[in-house]
Amino acid sequence: MAIRRCWPRVVPGPALGWLLLLLNVLAPGRASPRLLDFPAPVCAQEGLSCRVKNSTCLDDSWIHPKNLTPSSPKNIYINLSVSSTQHGELVPVLHVEWTLQTDASILYLEGAELSVLQLNTNERLCVKFQFLSMLQHHRKRWRFSFSHFVVDPGQEYEVTVHHLPKPIPDGDPNHKSKIIFVPDCEDSKMKMTTSCVSSGSLWDPNITVETLDTQHLRVDFTLWNESTPYQVLLESFSDSENHSCFDVVKQIFAPRQEEFHQRANVTFTLSKFHWCCHHHVQVQPFFSSCLNDCLRHAVTVPCPVISNTTVPKPVADYIPLWVYGLITLIAILLVGSVIVLIICMTWRLSGADQEKHGDDSKINGILPVADLTPPPLRPRKVWIVYSADHPLYVEVVLKFAQFLITACGTEVALDLLEEQVISEVGVMTWVSRQKQEMVESNSKIIILCSRGTQAKWKAILGWAEPAVQLRCDHWKPAGDLFTAAMNMILPDFKRPACFGTYVVCYFSGICSERDVPDLFNITSRYPLMDRFEEVYFRIQDLEMFEPGRMHHVRELTGDNYLQSPSGRQLKEAVLRFQEWQTQCPDWFERENLCLADGQDLPSLDEEVFEDPLLPPGGGIVKQQPLVRELPSDGCLVVDVCVSEEESRMAKLDPQLWPQRELVAHTLQSMVLPAEQVPAAHVVEPLHLPDGSGAAAQLPMTEDSEACPLLGVQRNSILCLPVDSDDLPLCSTPMMSPDHLQGDAREQLESLMLSVLQQSLSGQPLESWPRPEVVLEGCTPSEEEQRQSVQSDQGYISRSSPQPPEWLTEEEELELGEPVESLSPEELRSLRKLQRQLFFWELEKNPGWNSLEPRRPTPEEQNPS
């Protein structure tokens, strides 16, 4: 609420006074409450000394509240009266009168505060009655009045009487208010005030309007005794409507003093329409006291009334004869057109009715087949994005892709079908290629939702849930392709124009709509195979429903997809996975490696898995021993250990890497029982009856793959784990010396020492010796990782420099002449350092993260 702090009679300072004077000059017509300057207000009574002074509407009791305060006034009476100022001007003033209550609170009454608030401008004016003496009880009720608030016509005010001191904020109010409305200058009492007289309240323009002819109108009025411009407004209406059909404004310049109270006239040119005859004339003065808000005087001129004595001539007297002929011709044409239209509509409706009742197909609302042209089907391509939750679910995805290819003629991009390409180009490159190809060819991306998709989506969002690492993703060479695909897909879901590229589906029976991530709630979700027909129309970019027709693919409607062999296989795969879910309700938690606590799932029952994809440890194990060269009189003996309990097949293929022209040699295979062959032994040449020797004898006693590196007429060491159930230390043909026998450990240490000596002496690599160490017991997956690691890293068994293949044993001995020997203490220190570097290299290899390499002991880390 705005607070007015000063008025013309109260000037706190010269700067504020000049500011108020400037505001009064800039806005002379602004209405605001003020105090009457004459006579001075008096509040003293018999038995009371009182003084009236201007107030800022902020009493000290608000800042320093008191405990005891007086009660509110008893009654308030407000009257409007007219008073004269010191200059003789008549102004409207408010007469405020109130009485006190007859209680003990008058003993604490220190005064009263009167305030007037102008409601339209929110300006407030306050005065304060300050009691200089204490009130005493007497026989009459104390009564006070104040008649010095000057108000303006047509304004609304709120008058408040507040006893002092004011109460505390939570105390009972001790004030009363009343609202009063001041009439405008049309009131008989207010018309005589100076403000109303200056705004023309006593001016009677005596407006007269005269119609000169049908096109001109003259307005006369009397001027007022002020040199001010006038404006005459004319607005015309029709006799039956309130909408203006014509308006015009005329200006009259300010008259001279001798022209005051004289008549002025202005002429208007009317509208050309004779029906625009109802006129409304207004005269607006621009007096200095009111400017644009001065009272307008108006007069209305109705349309002229046609006299009954004036009989108009018949219209027929003015119409020529040819008009009658034209009207008759138009009437005949209209009637003929209506007749022809009725005949045509009748004929058309009868023909349509015959067609409708003559064809049974049309009775059912189906158009003839000959009249419909089915939309053309084009070969399309889709990319299937899924999460490998379980081997059975992967089988369902494969069967679904097979159904799309065989039954629907749709090309499918699936990671399981392009593992070789993914291994060549990488996961992200393959995913980005598929995404770009789908966008450029306007193809579709099918997203198959399952429990794994929901879990991986929550992992992408960073929810406080366990991490997701599914067992099938761990088996796949490419790993988790769903997360990589989602990272490529996410930006498209910020653009609504890209929503049509994606088709979100889930297999009903093994998945539910709860498995669909929240990201896809803005798109349609299709349960398979219930709504596969709609999915197929999405793939073809065709509308299934059109005005008056509905398209169907008979082979895909309902359960008709079971008529095709691929559809039946898909159904069987879904039922097989559904049965597995029923037997193992916690199958997903057990498939998640992060929740399985390192325990493997039990092997799946053969009754459930009739045709497993790649069960753990299953399949055909292919082992390729590397044969460098055989002499003409030598042969290679491959010994395969067959265990009666094993039901798998193992294939051992020798792969020859000749360095020069090969000579004829003999290859002999022998099958020995596993219990007759030791776990690890030094292989001795086997002399055959024809005199040739065997290169090596390798017993297959483990489920893993072994790749012995056989040298020319040399014995190889086969190192196995100490416990047959333990995994090897690493996936490369090297092991910690702790698991080697005494001879093998000495041979390995001699190899390290030889390498170190050759590096110190700067001899060529061709002079290095050729002892080799071969490990057995690596799984097929670890062997694949080993081959890739060997090709990329280069530091394992193949990183050991090998002498040229064409050197004989005597030439190698000549090249391997010993260098200057070192002291035993230096050799021991170098040997420990080489062993420490060897084990550190094993730990740094990225392909050994899942294994537990042996760390060097503190004594080995700090050689003496």
Swiss-Prot record:
Full protein name: Interleukin-17 receptor A
Residues modified by glycosylation: N54, N79, N206, N225, N242, N265, N308
Gene3D superfamilies given in the database record: 3.40.50.11530, Interleukin-17 receptor A/B, fibronectin-III-like domain 1, Interleukin-17 receptor A/B, fibronectin-III-like domain 2
Signal peptide: 1-31
Gene Ontology biological-process entries: defense response to fungus; fibroblast activation; granulocyte chemotaxis; inflammatory response; innate immune response; interleukin-17-mediated signaling pathway; interleukin-17A-mediated signaling pathway; positive regulation of chemokine (C-X-C motif) ligand 1 production
Spans within the Cytoplasmic topological domain: 344-864
Cystines in this chain: C43-C50, C57-C126, C185-C196, C245-C276, C277-C303, C290-C294
Membrane spanning stretches: 323-343
Tissue specificity remark: Widely expressed. Highly expressed in T cells and macrophages. Highly expressed in B-1a B cells and at a lower extent in B-1b and B-2 B cells (at protein level).
Gene designation per UniProt: Il17ra
Domain of life of the organism encoding this protein: Eukaryota
Extracellular membrane side: 32-322
Record PTM Phosphoserine, positions in chain: S736
Stretches for region Disordered: 778-824
Function comment: Receptor for IL17A and IL17F, major effector cytokines of innate and adaptive immune system involved in antimicrobial host defense and maintenance of tissue integrity. Receptor for IL17A. Receptor for IL17F. Binds to IL17A with higher affinity than to IL17F. Binds IL17A and IL17F homodimers as part of a heterodimeric complex with IL17RC. Also binds heterodimers formed by IL17A and IL17F as part of a heterodimeric complex with IL17RC. (Microbial infection) Receptor for SARS coronavirus-2/SARS-CoV-2 virus protein ORF8, leading to IL17 pathway activation and an increased secretion of pro-inflammatory factors through activating NF-kappa-B signaling pathway.
